[in-house]
């Protein structure tokens, strides 16, 4: 039996027609699910009883369950530990900013990439999430918090472009007017550097934001921190980024976690500036969040500001990311499913 949210609109309309039902029923079903948060076909009372019975016989509705949630002291972030139908665990985070509410979602259970400073890969990789399971995360966080979701970032556990087909399907579906109606411009896709998939995403010409986890300004250091760099080095990665800009007209965001005595010197900043000058980019500096089992530390505020100033003087737009959720293991690099460790 298929999960209803795994199907795109064309697939559902085709199923309705095969079962002698009118295609407008899809809009009614979507209204129940996405507007009212109703996840029981029986309670969709403007559908004929016969259709409700057919839906129950053929499709599963969301089964994602909240196992645990933890709110930050300032109330601006909530981390959720969620259990999938096969009892595997994933994490999602609700982040409240002045401009609206952002959800940080997982795209895989675990991760294959093995980045040396990240917590997610410590537990290994289990499987990809389906498009429906990504949508479920939004529905669960929305229902639990009673907050309107305005932005989506795919920066939870997993490498989004390693699950390219399902991520693409997910983005298309949440963009639909009768579903969540989230603008592509309010979706951020993160990657540690899967070059062919960056180019494939560019070919789709969706005006999403691409966020590249760079974290080093040269191949020698990046090879140490991000193993996938040994397959596609900086030159290839940057070529793919410029290709994405050319195809979409969208600025690329480069994420750079500042780690004490690893990648945080003025020399590193100068190298980074040289790589990115005169390009349509933005640099997000992320003060490293200390992680248990990772022997890295956060630089001083003085070093962070010096690094930032070098980039600013080079004319590169740069911000120091305001981290919400670090105290609840919910910030970048800290999405750990401690609850599920046995």
Swiss-Prot record:
GO terms for biological process: rRNA base methylation; tRNA methylation. CDD domains: Radical_SAM (cd01335). Its EC number is 2.1.1.192. InterPro entries: Aldolase_TIM, Methyltransferase_A, RlmN_N, RNA_MTrfase_RlmN, rRNA_lsu_MTrfase_RlmN/Cfr, rSAM. It is an enzyme of class 2 (transferase). SUPFAM superfamilies: Radical SAM enzymes. One of its GO terms (cellular component) is cytoplasm. [4Fe-4S] cluster binds at residues 111, 115, 118. S-adenosyl-L-methionine binds at residues 158-159, 190, 213-215, 289. GO terms for molecular function: 4 iron, 4 sulfur cluster binding; metal ion binding; rRNA (adenine(2503)-C2-)-methyltransferase activity; rRNA binding; tRNA (adenine(37)-C2)-methyltransferase activity; tRNA binding. It catalyses: adenosine(2503) in 23S rRNA + 2 reduced [2Fe-2S]-[ferredoxin] + 2 S-adenosyl-L-methionine = 2-methyladenosine(2503) in 23S rRNA + 5'-deoxyadenosine + L-methionine + 2 oxidized [2Fe-2S]-[ferredoxin] + S-adenosyl-L-homocysteine; adenosine(37) in tRNA + 2 reduced [2Fe-2S]-[ferredoxin] + 2 S-adenosyl-L-methionine = 2-methyladenosine(37) in tRNA + 5'-deoxyadenosine + L-methionine + 2 oxidized [2Fe-2S]-[ferredoxin] + S-adenosyl-L-homocysteine. Keywords: 4Fe-4S, Cytoplasm, Disulfide bond, Iron, Iron-sulfur, Metal-binding, Methyltransferase, rRNA processing, S-adenosyl-L-methionine, Transferase, tRNA processing. Its main location: cytoplasm. Disulfide bonds join 104-332. Its cofactor is [4Fe-4S] cluster. The active site is at 91 (proton acceptor), 332 (s-methylcysteine intermediate). It holds the Pfam family Radical_SAM. It comes from the Bacteria. Residues 97-327 form the Radical SAM core domain. Reaction proceeds by a ping-pong mechanism involving intermediate methylation of a conserved cysteine residue. Specifically methylates position 2 of adenine 2503 in 23S rRNA and position 2 of adenine 37 in tRNAs. PANTHER family: 23S RRNA METHYLTRANSFERASE, RADICAL SAM CORE DOMAIN-CONTAINING PROTEIN. This is Probable dual-specificity RNA methyltransferase RlmN. It comes from Carboxydothermus hydrogenoformans (strain ATCC BAA-161 / DSM 6008 / Z-2901).
């Amino acid at each position: 039996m298929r999960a209803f949210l795994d199907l795109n609109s064309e697939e559902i309309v085709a199923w309705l027609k095969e079962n002698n039902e009118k295609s407008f029923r899809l809009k009614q079903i979507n209204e129940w699910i996405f507007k009212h948060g109703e996840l029981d076909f029986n309670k969709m009372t403007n559908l004929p009883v016969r259709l409700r019975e057919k839906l129950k016989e053929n499709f599963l509705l969301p089964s994602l369950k909240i196992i645990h949630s933890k709110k930050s002291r300032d109330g601006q972030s909530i981390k959720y530990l969620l259990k999938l139908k096969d009892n595997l665990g994933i994490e999602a985070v609700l982040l409240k900013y002045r401009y609206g509410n952002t959800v940080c979602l997982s795209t895989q259970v675990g991760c294959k990439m093995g980045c040396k400073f990240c917590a997610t890969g410590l537990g290994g990789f289990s499987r990809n999430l389906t498009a429906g399971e990504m949508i479920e995360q939004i529905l669960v966080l929305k229902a639990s918090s009673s907050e309107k979701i305005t932005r989506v970032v795919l920066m939870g556990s997993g490498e989004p472009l390693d699950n390219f087909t399902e991520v693409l399907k997910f983005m298309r579906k949440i963009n639909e007017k009768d579903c969540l109606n989230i603008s592509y411009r309010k979706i951020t896709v993160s990657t540690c550097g899967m070059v062919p998939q960056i180019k494939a995403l560019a070919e789709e010409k969706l005006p999403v934001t691409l966020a590249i986890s760079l974290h080093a300004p040269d191949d020698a250091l990046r090879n140490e921190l991000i193993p996938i760099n040994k397959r596609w080095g900086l030159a290839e990665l940057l070529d793919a980024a410029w290709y994405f800009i050319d195809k979409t007209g969208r600025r690329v965001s480069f994420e750079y976690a500042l780690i004490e005595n690893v990648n945080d010197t003025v020399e590193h900043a100068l190298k980074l500036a040289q790589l990115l000058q005169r390009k349509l980019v933005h640099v997000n500096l992320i003060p490293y969040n200390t992680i248990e089992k990772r022997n890295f530390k956060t630089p001083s505020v003085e070093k962070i500001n010096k690094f930032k100033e070098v980039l600013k003087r080079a004319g590169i737009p740069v911000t120091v990311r305001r981290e919400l959720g670090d105290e609840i293991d919910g910030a970048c690099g800290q999405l750990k499913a401690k609850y599920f460790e046995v």
